[in-house]
């Protein structure tokens, strides 16, 4: 299920509305990414986090040493 483990954002029901004003059911799903997060105690955990939480800086992403060396070069 697409649910953010930080803010609790989850899919919401809504309607598609056509030009002729017909309503059909649909789901609005949050943009949830599976990322590796560095926790406060120093451990790394894979979590489902929405992109608005990532952009707001509510979590710290984990970058391995090999990735950080590649980023510097």
From Swiss-Prot:
Keywords: Ribonucleoprotein, Ribosomal protein. InterPro entries: Bacterial_rp_bL28, Ribosomal_bL28, Ribosomal_bL28/bL31-like_sf, Ribosomal_bL28_bact-type, Ribosomal_bL28_sf. One of its GO terms (biological process) is translation. One of its GO terms (cellular component) is ribosome. It holds the Pfam family Ribosomal_L28. The keyword Ribosomal protein applies. This is Large ribosomal subunit protein bL28. It comes from Fervidobacterium nodosum (strain ATCC 35602 / DSM 5306 / Rt17-B1).
